[in-house]
Curated annotation (Swiss-Prot):
Gene name per UniProt: POLR1D
Top-level taxon of the source organism: Eukaryota
Protein's recorded name: DNA-directed RNA polymerases I and III subunit RPAC2
Any one of the GO BP annotations: transcription by RNA polymerase III
Modified residues (N-acetylmethionine): 1
InterPro entries in alphabetical order: RBP11-like, RBP11-like_dimer, RNA_pol_Rpb11_13-16kDa_CS, RNAP_AC19, Rpo11-like
PANTHER family recorded: DNA-DIRECTED RNA POLYMERASE I,II,III, DNA-DIRECTED RNA POLYMERASES I AND III SUBUNIT RPAC2
Subcellular location as annotated: Nucleus
GO-annotated molecular function: DNA binding; DNA-directed RNA polymerase activity; protein dimerization activity
Region (Disordered): 1-22
Quaternary organization: Component of the RNA polymerase I and RNA polymerase III complexes consisting of at least 13 and 17 subunits, respectively.
One Pfam family linked to the record: RNA_pol_L_2
Function summary: DNA-dependent RNA polymerase catalyzes the transcription of DNA into RNA using the four ribonucleoside triphosphates as substrates. Common component of RNA polymerases I and III which synthesize ribosomal RNA precursor pre-rRNA and short non-coding RNAs including 5S rRNA, snRNAs, tRNAs and miRNAs, respectively.
Length: 133
């Protein structure tokens, strides 16, 4: 029971988002009857293969994860089902959260490198323009 409450506390920060003045669920956590917290399906609304495959890759890098896969429910629906199964005592929500954090860090690194390259290009272009005068 305490583990379930702890799991709910961890998930409470990412469950909902505000859309057009009303509360809309962005993420659902689904457990099949008879399963434990080590095998969970996360339903991510308004997402597609872009996040699904990237997140699956980041989660599978965790050696405690036995299985991670995702499916799109239907081409006309914007949601994915991401299933995580872990080994040992690690609840599935932890690699999910770590995968999101790791993916955000990778995206931030790519953005930083991209912006630095743009700045370097503009600086080089400006110095070439000054040299021609």
């Amino acid at each position: 029971m305490e583990e379930d409450q702890e799991l709910e506390r961890k998930m409470s920060g990412v469950k909902t988002s505000m859309a057009e003045g009303e509360r809309k669920t962005a993420l659902e956590m689904v457990q099949a009857a008879g399963t434990d917290r080590h095998c969970v399906t996360f339903v991510l609304h308004e997402e597609d293969h872009t996040l699904g495959n990237s997140l699956r890759y980041m989660i599978m890098k965790n050696p405690e994860v036995e299985f991670c896969g995702y499916t799109t429910t239907h081409p006309s629906e914007s949601k994915i089902n991401l299933r995580i199964q872990t080994r040992g005592a690690l609840p599935a929500v932890e690699p999910f959260q770590r995968g999101l954090t790791d993916l955000m860090n990778v995206c931030q690194h790519v953005l930083d490198k991209f912006e630095a390259s743009i700045k370097e290009y503009k600086d080089q272009k400006a110095s070439r323009n000054e040299a021609t005068f």
